[in-house]
Protein backbone atom coordinates (compact mmCIF):
# COMPACT_ATOMS: atom_id res chain seq x y z
CA UNK A 1 0.00 0.00 0.00
CA UNK A 2 1.36 3.48 -0.80
CA UNK A 3 2.46 5.56 2.15
CA UNK A 4 -0.15 7.97 3.52
CA UNK A 5 -2.65 7.41 0.69
CA UNK A 6 -5.23 9.56 2.45
CA UNK A 7 -2.92 12.55 2.20
CA UNK A 8 -2.37 12.17 -1.52
CA UNK A 9 -4.30 13.82 -4.31
CA UNK A 10 -6.33 12.45 -7.16
CA UNK A 11 -6.55 14.01 -10.56
CA UNK A 12 -9.85 15.43 -9.36
CA UNK A 13 -12.88 16.44 -11.39
CA UNK A 14 -10.85 18.31 -13.99
CA UNK A 15 -8.33 17.56 -16.67
CA UNK A 16 -4.96 19.33 -16.60
CA UNK A 17 -5.28 22.94 -17.67
CA UNK A 18 -3.32 22.28 -20.85
CA UNK A 19 -6.12 20.06 -22.18
CA UNK A 20 -9.07 21.67 -23.87
CA UNK A 21 -12.35 19.73 -23.35
CA UNK A 22 -14.29 19.37 -26.56
CA UNK A 23 -16.45 16.25 -26.65
CA UNK A 24 -18.09 13.96 -24.11
CA UNK A 25 -17.76 10.25 -23.54
CA UNK A 26 -21.11 9.09 -22.13
CA UNK A 27 -21.34 6.27 -19.64
CA UNK A 28 -22.81 3.84 -22.14
CA UNK A 29 -22.66 0.40 -20.56
CA UNK A 30 -25.78 -1.66 -21.24
CA UNK A 31 -26.43 -2.34 -17.57
CA UNK A 32 -25.42 0.94 -15.98
CA UNK A 33 -25.94 3.53 -18.68
CA UNK A 34 -26.81 7.15 -18.07
CA UNK A 35 -30.05 6.50 -19.93
CA UNK A 36 -31.02 3.78 -17.48
CA UNK A 37 -30.39 6.02 -14.51
CA UNK A 38 -31.38 9.30 -16.14
CA UNK A 39 -35.14 8.94 -15.69
CA UNK A 40 -34.69 8.82 -11.92
CA UNK A 41 -34.21 12.53 -11.42
CA UNK A 42 -34.59 13.99 -14.88
CA UNK A 43 -30.83 14.49 -15.09
CA UNK A 44 -28.02 12.14 -16.13
CA UNK A 45 -26.87 10.47 -12.92
CA UNK A 46 -23.58 9.20 -14.29
CA UNK A 47 -20.56 11.40 -14.87
CA UNK A 48 -19.49 12.44 -18.33
CA UNK A 49 -15.83 12.64 -19.28
CA UNK A 50 -14.57 15.73 -21.03
CA UNK A 51 -12.21 14.58 -23.76
CA UNK A 52 -9.56 16.52 -25.63
CA UNK A 53 -9.86 16.69 -29.40
CA UNK A 54 -8.79 13.47 -31.13
CA UNK A 55 -5.22 13.89 -32.26
CA UNK A 56 -4.34 16.44 -29.59
CA UNK A 57 -0.81 15.91 -28.27
CA UNK A 58 -0.64 14.75 -24.65
CA UNK A 59 2.37 14.63 -22.36
CA UNK A 60 2.92 11.45 -20.34
CA UNK A 61 1.35 13.12 -17.31
CA UNK A 62 -1.65 14.44 -19.22
CA UNK A 63 -2.32 11.01 -20.70
CA UNK A 64 -2.20 9.31 -17.29
CA UNK A 65 -4.41 12.02 -15.76
CA UNK A 66 -6.93 11.33 -18.51
CA UNK A 67 -6.74 7.58 -17.78
CA UNK A 68 -7.52 8.28 -14.12
CA UNK A 69 -10.49 10.41 -15.11
CA UNK A 70 -11.76 7.67 -17.43
CA UNK A 71 -11.50 5.19 -14.55
CA UNK A 72 -14.03 7.27 -12.61
CA UNK A 73 -16.66 6.46 -15.22
CA UNK A 74 -16.78 2.91 -13.87
CA UNK A 75 -18.96 1.32 -11.23
CA UNK A 76 -17.72 0.06 -7.86
CA UNK A 77 -18.03 -3.63 -7.16
CA UNK A 78 -16.26 -6.90 -7.87
CA UNK A 79 -13.52 -5.25 -9.95
CA UNK A 80 -11.43 -2.09 -9.50
CA UNK A 81 -12.01 1.20 -11.32
CA UNK A 82 -9.54 1.37 -14.22
CA UNK A 83 -9.07 3.68 -17.20
CA UNK A 84 -6.87 3.42 -20.30
CA UNK A 85 -5.65 5.90 -22.91
CA UNK A 86 -3.99 5.10 -26.24
CA UNK A 87 -1.79 7.58 -28.09
CA UNK A 88 0.43 7.18 -31.10
CA UNK A 89 4.21 7.14 -30.67
CA UNK A 90 4.25 10.95 -30.74
CA UNK A 91 1.60 11.38 -28.04
CA UNK A 92 -1.41 12.18 -30.23
CA UNK A 93 -4.63 11.01 -28.56
CA UNK A 94 -6.24 8.03 -30.28
CA UNK A 95 -8.68 6.23 -27.96
CA UNK A 96 -9.93 6.14 -24.36
CA UNK A 97 -11.43 3.18 -22.50
CA UNK A 98 -12.60 2.24 -19.02
CA UNK A 99 -13.97 -0.76 -17.16
CA UNK A 100 -17.75 -0.76 -16.73
CA UNK A 101 -18.11 -3.60 -14.21
CA UNK A 102 -17.60 -7.31 -13.70
CA UNK A 103 -18.06 -9.35 -16.86
CA UNK A 104 -17.53 -6.38 -19.19
CA UNK A 105 -14.24 -5.67 -21.03
CA UNK A 106 -11.41 -4.34 -18.91
CA UNK A 107 -10.21 -0.80 -19.60
CA UNK A 108 -7.39 -1.91 -21.89
CA UNK A 109 -9.71 -4.17 -23.88
CA UNK A 110 -12.30 -1.40 -24.09
CA UNK A 111 -9.77 1.02 -25.59
CA UNK A 112 -8.45 -1.66 -27.95
CA UNK A 113 -11.99 -2.46 -29.09
CA UNK A 114 -12.51 1.21 -29.94
CA UNK A 115 -9.30 1.11 -31.97
CA UNK A 116 -10.43 -1.98 -33.88
CA UNK A 117 -13.83 -0.44 -34.58
CA UNK A 118 -12.15 2.67 -35.98
CA UNK A 119 -9.58 0.68 -37.98
CA UNK A 120 -6.68 2.31 -36.10
CA UNK A 121 -3.23 0.81 -36.67
CA UNK A 122 -1.68 0.55 -33.19
CA UNK A 123 1.78 -0.53 -34.29
CA UNK A 124 4.23 1.44 -32.15
CA UNK A 125 1.46 3.09 -30.11
CA UNK A 126 1.57 3.88 -26.39
CA UNK A 127 -0.96 2.87 -23.77
CA UNK A 128 -1.48 4.56 -20.39
CA UNK A 129 -3.46 2.60 -17.82
CA UNK A 130 -4.28 3.51 -14.22
CA UNK A 131 -3.62 -0.05 -12.98
CA UNK A 132 -1.09 -2.63 -14.18
CA UNK A 133 -2.74 -4.88 -16.80
CA UNK A 134 -3.98 -8.20 -15.46
CA UNK A 135 -2.33 -11.45 -16.47
CA UNK A 136 -5.08 -13.99 -15.84
CA UNK A 137 -8.19 -15.37 -17.47
CA UNK A 138 -11.33 -14.78 -15.42
CA UNK A 139 -14.65 -13.54 -16.76
CA UNK A 140 -12.55 -11.90 -19.49
CA UNK A 141 -9.14 -12.69 -21.00
CA UNK A 142 -5.75 -11.39 -19.79
CA UNK A 143 -5.26 -7.74 -20.73
CA UNK A 144 -1.47 -8.09 -20.89
CA UNK A 145 -1.81 -10.56 -23.77
CA UNK A 146 -4.31 -8.36 -25.61
CA UNK A 147 -2.02 -5.32 -25.29
CA UNK A 148 0.99 -7.19 -26.64
CA UNK A 149 -0.98 -8.71 -29.53
CA UNK A 150 -2.33 -5.27 -30.52
CA UNK A 151 1.14 -3.96 -31.36
CA UNK A 152 1.48 -1.53 -28.44
CA UNK A 153 5.19 -0.74 -28.05
CA UNK A 154 5.16 1.18 -24.75
CA UNK A 155 2.92 0.77 -21.72
CA UNK A 156 2.71 3.20 -18.79
CA UNK A 157 0.88 2.23 -15.60
CA UNK A 158 0.21 4.06 -12.35
CA UNK A 159 -0.11 1.29 -9.76
CA UNK A 160 1.06 -2.31 -9.60
CA UNK A 161 -1.66 -4.94 -9.31
CA UNK A 162 -0.16 -7.61 -7.07
CA UNK A 163 -3.48 -9.23 -6.19
CA UNK A 164 -3.50 -13.01 -6.34
CA UNK A 165 -5.34 -13.44 -9.63
CA UNK A 166 -3.98 -10.50 -11.59
CA UNK A 167 -0.26 -10.02 -10.89
CA UNK A 168 2.39 -10.39 -13.57
CA UNK A 169 1.05 -8.24 -16.37
CA UNK A 170 4.07 -5.95 -16.58
CA UNK A 171 6.49 -8.89 -16.54
CA UNK A 172 4.59 -10.62 -19.34
CA UNK A 173 4.60 -7.48 -21.48
CA UNK A 174 8.36 -7.09 -21.04
CA UNK A 175 8.81 -10.71 -22.10
CA UNK A 176 6.95 -9.83 -25.31
CA UNK A 177 9.23 -6.89 -26.09
CA UNK A 178 6.93 -4.12 -24.81
CA UNK A 179 8.71 -1.32 -22.95
CA UNK A 180 7.00 -0.86 -19.59
CA UNK A 181 7.11 2.29 -17.44
CA UNK A 182 5.88 2.64 -13.85
CA UNK A 183 4.60 6.19 -13.26
CA UNK A 184 5.04 6.11 -9.50
CA UNK A 185 4.02 9.73 -9.03
CA UNK A 186 0.47 8.65 -9.92
CA UNK A 187 0.44 5.51 -7.75
CA UNK A 188 -1.36 7.06 -4.81
CA UNK A 189 -4.01 8.61 -7.04
CA UNK A 190 -4.73 5.19 -8.53
CA UNK A 191 -4.73 3.52 -5.12
CA UNK A 192 -7.09 6.12 -3.70
CA UNK A 193 -9.67 5.30 -6.38
CA UNK A 194 -9.77 1.68 -5.25
CA UNK A 195 -8.60 1.74 -1.63
CA UNK A 196 -11.40 -0.41 -0.23
CA UNK A 197 -11.28 -2.79 -3.21
CA UNK A 198 -7.61 -3.48 -2.50
CA UNK A 199 -8.41 -4.08 1.18
CA UNK A 200 -11.16 -6.57 0.28
CA UNK A 201 -8.87 -8.35 -2.20
CA UNK A 202 -6.07 -8.60 0.37
CA UNK A 203 -8.51 -10.02 2.93
CA UNK A 204 -9.83 -12.54 0.37
CA UNK A 205 -13.45 -11.51 0.82
CA UNK A 206 -16.13 -9.91 -1.36
CA UNK A 207 -16.30 -6.16 -1.85
CA UNK A 208 -19.28 -5.13 0.28
CA UNK A 209 -21.92 -2.53 -0.58
CA UNK A 210 -24.42 -1.75 2.18
CA UNK A 211 -27.72 -0.06 1.42
CA UNK A 212 -30.15 1.64 3.78
CA UNK A 213 -33.30 3.72 3.25
CA UNK A 214 -34.63 5.85 6.07
CA UNK A 215 -36.47 8.97 7.17
CA UNK A 216 -34.54 12.13 7.91
CA UNK A 217 -34.33 11.13 11.56
CA UNK A 218 -33.00 7.66 10.81
CA UNK A 219 -35.99 5.30 10.98
CA UNK A 220 -36.75 2.52 8.50
CA UNK A 221 -40.22 1.65 9.84
CA UNK A 222 -42.89 3.26 12.00
CA UNK A 223 -43.63 2.14 15.55
CA UNK A 224 -46.38 -0.16 14.24
CA UNK A 225 -43.98 -1.78 11.76
CA UNK A 226 -45.26 -0.13 8.56
CA UNK A 227 -42.53 0.77 6.08
CA UNK A 228 -44.01 0.69 2.55
CA UNK A 229 -42.98 3.00 1.33
CA UNK A 230 -40.62 5.46 3.01
CA UNK A 231 -38.70 6.28 -0.16
CA UNK A 232 -40.25 6.89 -3.56
CA UNK A 233 -40.13 4.85 -6.79
CA UNK A 234 -36.91 6.46 -8.06
CA UNK A 235 -34.91 5.48 -4.99
CA UNK A 236 -36.36 1.98 -5.01
CA UNK A 237 -35.46 1.50 -8.67
CA UNK A 238 -31.96 2.69 -7.92
CA UNK A 239 -31.67 0.09 -5.17
CA UNK A 240 -32.65 -2.63 -7.64
CA UNK A 241 -29.86 -1.51 -9.96
CA UNK A 242 -27.38 -2.02 -7.13
CA UNK A 243 -28.79 -5.52 -6.62
CA UNK A 244 -28.34 -6.16 -10.32
CA UNK A 245 -24.64 -5.33 -10.30
CA UNK A 246 -23.90 -7.43 -7.19
CA UNK A 247 -23.01 -11.12 -7.23
CA UNK A 248 -25.10 -11.70 -4.10
CA UNK A 249 -27.60 -9.79 -1.96
CA UNK A 250 -27.87 -10.63 1.73
CA UNK A 251 -30.38 -10.12 4.55
CA UNK A 252 -30.75 -11.54 8.04
CA UNK A 253 -33.28 -14.07 9.25
CA UNK A 254 -35.30 -11.45 11.13
CA UNK A 255 -35.83 -9.36 7.99
CA UNK A 256 -36.71 -12.52 6.08
CA UNK A 257 -39.34 -13.59 8.61
CA UNK A 258 -40.86 -10.12 9.01
CA UNK A 259 -40.83 -8.81 5.43
CA UNK A 260 -40.74 -11.99 3.29
CA UNK A 261 -38.84 -10.27 0.44
CA UNK A 262 -38.04 -11.84 -2.93
CA UNK A 263 -34.57 -10.21 -3.21
CA UNK A 264 -34.82 -10.24 -6.99
CA UNK A 265 -33.46 -7.42 -9.17
CA UNK A 266 -35.95 -5.59 -11.39
CA UNK A 267 -35.73 -2.79 -13.90
CA UNK A 268 -37.67 0.48 -13.99
CA UNK A 269 -40.66 -1.34 -15.52
CA UNK A 270 -40.75 -3.95 -12.78
CA UNK A 271 -39.37 -6.68 -15.04
CA UNK A 272 -36.77 -9.07 -13.68
CA UNK A 273 -33.25 -8.68 -15.07
CA UNK A 274 -31.91 -11.78 -16.77
CA UNK A 275 -28.90 -11.70 -14.45
CA UNK A 276 -30.03 -12.23 -10.85
CA UNK A 277 -27.85 -12.10 -7.73
CA UNK A 278 -27.47 -15.03 -5.38
CA UNK A 279 -30.04 -14.59 -2.59
CA UNK A 280 -28.36 -15.03 0.79
CA UNK A 281 -29.82 -15.22 4.29
CA UNK A 282 -27.51 -15.04 7.32
CA UNK A 283 -28.68 -16.47 10.63
CA UNK A 284 -29.42 -19.67 12.52
CA UNK A 285 -33.21 -19.76 12.20
CA UNK A 286 -33.95 -22.01 9.24
CA UNK A 287 -35.87 -20.30 6.44
CA UNK A 288 -38.56 -22.73 5.33
CA UNK A 289 -39.72 -23.35 1.78
CA UNK A 290 -42.78 -21.12 2.00
CA UNK A 291 -40.69 -17.92 2.15
CA UNK A 292 -40.33 -16.13 -1.16
CA UNK A 293 -36.57 -15.73 -0.89
CA UNK A 294 -36.23 -19.49 -1.35
CA UNK A 295 -37.49 -19.09 -4.94
CA UNK A 296 -39.79 -22.11 -4.83
CA UNK A 297 -43.09 -20.27 -5.24
CA UNK A 298 -42.40 -17.38 -7.64
CA UNK A 299 -45.03 -15.03 -9.08
CA UNK A 300 -46.89 -16.10 -12.19
CA UNK A 301 -44.68 -16.01 -15.26
CA UNK A 302 -41.42 -16.32 -13.27
CA UNK A 303 -39.52 -19.60 -13.20
CA UNK A 304 -38.64 -21.12 -9.83
CA UNK A 305 -34.92 -20.91 -9.05
CA UNK A 306 -34.27 -22.50 -5.65
CA UNK A 307 -30.65 -23.17 -6.65
CA UNK A 308 -29.98 -19.40 -6.49
CA UNK A 309 -30.61 -19.31 -2.73
CA UNK A 310 -28.15 -19.85 0.11
CA UNK A 311 -28.59 -19.73 3.87
CA UNK A 312 -25.42 -19.49 5.95
CA UNK A 313 -26.15 -20.65 9.49
CA UNK A 314 -23.90 -18.27 11.38
CA UNK A 315 -23.82 -14.92 13.17
CA UNK A 316 -20.12 -14.46 12.36
CA UNK A 317 -19.55 -12.04 9.43
CA UNK A 318 -16.13 -13.51 8.62
CA UNK A 319 -17.53 -17.02 8.43
CA UNK A 320 -20.23 -15.81 6.05
CA UNK A 321 -17.71 -13.99 3.87
CA UNK A 322 -15.41 -17.01 3.72
CA UNK A 323 -18.32 -19.13 2.51
CA UNK A 324 -19.36 -16.61 -0.15
CA UNK A 325 -15.80 -16.02 -1.35
CA UNK A 326 -15.30 -19.78 -1.74
CA UNK A 327 -18.43 -19.82 -3.93
CA UNK A 328 -17.02 -17.13 -6.22
CA UNK A 329 -18.92 -14.14 -4.82
CA UNK A 330 -16.78 -11.03 -5.27
CA UNK A 331 -19.42 -8.33 -4.69
CA UNK A 332 -21.93 -8.62 -1.85
CA UNK A 333 -24.80 -6.22 -1.26
CA UNK A 334 -26.13 -6.02 2.31
CA UNK A 335 -29.80 -5.18 1.97
CA UNK A 336 -30.69 -5.41 5.64
CA UNK A 337 -31.84 -5.35 8.19
CA UNK A 338 -30.46 -2.79 10.58
CA UNK A 339 -28.71 -5.46 12.64
CA UNK A 340 -26.73 -6.60 9.60
CA UNK A 341 -25.64 -3.05 8.78
CA UNK A 342 -24.52 -2.49 12.36
CA UNK A 343 -22.76 -5.84 12.62
CA UNK A 344 -20.71 -5.37 9.46
CA UNK A 345 -20.00 -1.68 10.13
CA UNK A 346 -18.69 -2.57 13.57
CA UNK A 347 -16.24 -5.02 11.98
CA UNK A 348 -15.10 -2.43 9.37
CA UNK A 349 -16.42 -4.67 6.62
CA UNK A 350 -18.51 -2.16 4.67
CA UNK A 351 -16.59 -0.87 1.65
CA UNK A 352 -19.35 1.28 0.13
CA UNK A 353 -22.55 2.65 1.65
CA UNK A 354 -25.53 3.97 -0.31
CA UNK A 355 -27.98 5.71 2.02
CA UNK A 356 -31.37 6.76 0.66
CA UNK A 357 -33.14 9.39 2.72
CA UNK A 358 -36.76 10.50 2.42
CA UNK A 359 -38.03 13.94 3.54
CA UNK A 360 -40.08 12.41 6.34
CA UNK A 361 -39.85 12.62 10.14
CA UNK A 362 -41.18 9.93 12.50
CA UNK A 363 -39.68 10.63 15.91
CA UNK A 364 -39.92 6.95 16.83
CA UNK A 365 -39.90 3.56 15.15
CA UNK A 366 -37.32 1.06 13.95
CA UNK A 367 -33.82 2.51 13.76
CA UNK A 368 -31.82 2.14 10.55
CA UNK A 369 -28.84 0.67 12.44
CA UNK A 370 -28.47 -1.36 15.59
CA UNK A 371 -26.12 -4.03 16.96
CA UNK A 372 -23.39 -1.39 16.71
CA UNK A 373 -22.00 -1.04 20.23
CA UNK A 374 -20.82 2.56 20.42
CA UNK A 375 -20.49 3.94 23.94
CA UNK A 376 -18.57 7.10 23.10
CA UNK A 377 -18.16 9.25 20.01
CA UNK A 378 -14.59 8.14 19.38
CA UNK A 379 -15.80 4.55 18.82
CA UNK A 380 -18.22 5.45 16.02
CA UNK A 381 -17.21 4.24 12.54
CA UNK A 382 -16.44 7.25 10.35
CA UNK A 383 -17.62 7.54 6.77
CA UNK A 384 -16.93 10.17 4.15
CA UNK A 385 -18.56 11.27 0.92
CA UNK A 386 -17.45 9.26 -2.11
CA UNK A 387 -16.61 11.76 -4.84
CA UNK A 388 -14.42 9.38 -6.80
CA UNK A 389 -16.78 6.87 -8.39
CA UNK A 390 -19.26 7.02 -11.23
CA UNK A 391 -21.86 9.04 -9.32
CA UNK A 392 -21.79 12.38 -7.54
CA UNK A 393 -21.56 11.90 -3.77
CA UNK A 394 -25.14 13.12 -3.31
CA UNK A 395 -27.89 12.59 -5.88
CA UNK A 396 -31.50 13.74 -5.96
CA UNK A 397 -33.86 10.88 -6.83
CA UNK A 398 -37.34 12.28 -7.17
CA UNK A 399 -38.14 13.64 -3.71
CA UNK A 400 -35.41 11.61 -2.00
CA UNK A 401 -31.62 11.77 -1.84
CA UNK A 402 -28.98 9.08 -2.27
CA UNK A 403 -25.69 9.63 -0.47
CA UNK A 404 -22.65 7.62 -1.55
CA UNK A 405 -20.18 6.98 1.27
CA UNK A 406 -16.97 5.09 1.89
CA UNK A 407 -15.20 4.45 5.20
CA UNK A 408 -12.63 6.98 6.29
CA UNK A 409 -9.12 5.67 5.51
CA UNK A 410 -7.77 3.18 7.98
CA UNK A 411 -5.17 4.52 10.37
CA UNK A 412 -6.39 8.13 10.22
CA UNK A 413 -7.82 10.18 13.03
CA UNK A 414 -10.46 11.98 11.04
CA UNK A 415 -12.28 14.76 12.82
CA UNK A 416 -16.02 15.33 12.29
CA UNK A 417 -16.48 17.29 9.09
CA UNK A 418 -12.94 16.63 7.89
CA UNK A 419 -12.71 15.25 4.38
CA UNK A 420 -10.04 14.26 1.91
CA UNK A 421 -9.62 17.04 -0.61
CA UNK A 422 -9.10 16.20 -4.23
CA UNK A 423 -7.19 19.01 -5.96
CA UNK A 424 -5.86 18.69 -9.47
CA UNK A 425 -2.48 17.14 -10.09
CA UNK A 426 -0.13 19.70 -11.55
CA UNK A 427 0.89 18.04 -14.79
CA UNK A 428 3.50 20.71 -15.43
CA UNK A 429 5.54 19.84 -12.34
CA UNK A 430 5.06 16.08 -11.97
CA UNK A 431 8.33 14.17 -12.53
CA UNK A 432 8.88 12.19 -15.69
CA UNK A 433 7.96 8.49 -15.50
CA UNK A 434 10.57 6.00 -14.34
CA UNK A 435 11.65 3.29 -16.76
CA UNK A 436 11.91 -0.08 -15.05
Residue ranges and their predicted role:
Residues 88, 202-203, 407-408:
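Active-site beta-strand termini and strand-to-loop segments that position acidic
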Residues 76, 103, 170, 179, ...:
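Proteins enriched for Cys/Gly/acidic motifs involved in redox and nucleic-acid/cofactor modification
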Residues 82, 123-126, 277:
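Residue-level recognition of the N-termini of beta-strands and the immediately preceding loop/turn
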Residues 76-91:
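N-terminal glycine-rich anion-binding loops that anchor highly charged ligand groups
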Residues 2-19, 24-79, 95, 139, ...:
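Enzymes that bind and transform nitrogen-containing heteroaromatic metabolites
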Residues 85, 107-111, 115, 211-213, ...:
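Short, compositionally biased "basic patch" segments
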Residues 88-189, 324, 343-345:
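Zn2+-dependent cytidine deaminase-like catalytic core
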Amino acid sequence: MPQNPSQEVLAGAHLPATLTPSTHLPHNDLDYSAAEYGHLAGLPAARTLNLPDPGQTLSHDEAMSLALQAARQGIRGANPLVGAVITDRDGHLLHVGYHRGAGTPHAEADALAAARAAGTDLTGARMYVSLEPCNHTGRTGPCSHAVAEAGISELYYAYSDDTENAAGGAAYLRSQGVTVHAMEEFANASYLLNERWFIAAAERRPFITAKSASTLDGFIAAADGTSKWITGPAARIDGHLIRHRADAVMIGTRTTLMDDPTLDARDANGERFEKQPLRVVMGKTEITENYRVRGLNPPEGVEADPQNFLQVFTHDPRELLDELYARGVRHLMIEGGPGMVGLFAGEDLIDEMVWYRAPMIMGQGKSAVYRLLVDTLAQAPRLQLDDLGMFPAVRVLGNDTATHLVPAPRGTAQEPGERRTLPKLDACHAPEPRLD
